[in-house]
Amino acid sequence: MENMLGLLRLHVIRGVNLAIRDSQSSDPYVIVRMGKQKLRTRVMKKNLNTEWNEDLTLSVTDPTLPVKIMVYDRDRFSRDDKMGDAIFHIDPFLEAIRIQNQLGGLPEGTVIMKIQASRQNCLSEESKIVWHKGKIVQNMFLKLQNVERGEIELQLEWIDVSGALTDDAEDVAF
């Protein structure tokens, strides 16, 4: 694999107030894309407030590529219906990793960085990047776009496999 910086584990926690696409409910699943990579969760039957609690792991070679989240309603006899989408960038998350590597020894629960919800991102509320149980994690609620309603809750975690984000590594442009 070309210059892999590390792995990004996305914990797809849940969908909240998802759109109805069948008669009274939906059978939602999530597709996650980054560059040419495409992963998906399992389908949850008849549920608009879905608890996936599923881990999907992406290889990060180009940290400037956005992560795209797409939610669909599974249909058995026709094309699956779109239930919204969202995009986020991992630059702030990777910058928080660099900060933690420089500071080291952070107390449990330390907030390393906050990202405000704005028109330039799909966050529905402030997202904090924190030091938790010896790892850097970011919890986020993404407001689904191109749909009447719905949010997806995710947690990001970095798995360093190359040392590319440590103090000793050469600068990697973000």
From Swiss-Prot:
It is found in: Cell membrane; Nucleus. Its cofactor is Ca(2+). GO terms for molecular function: GTPase activator activity; metal ion binding; phospholipid binding. It comes from the Eukaryota. Its main location: membrane. Pfam families: C2. Gene3D superfamilies: C2 domain (2.60.40.150). Keywords: Abscisic acid signaling pathway, Acetylation, Calcium, Cell membrane, GTPase activation, Lipid-binding, Membrane, Metal-binding, Nucleus. Ca(2+) 1 binds at residues 21-22, 73, 75, 81. GO terms for cellular component: nucleus; plasma membrane. Binds to PYR/PYL/RCAR abscisic acid intracellular receptors in an ABA-independent manner, both at the plasma membrane and in the nucleus. This is Protein C2-DOMAIN ABA-RELATED 2. It comes from Arabidopsis thaliana (Mouse-ear cress). The lineage of its organism: Eukaryota, Viridiplantae, Streptophyta, Embryophyta, Tracheophyta. The gene is CAR2.
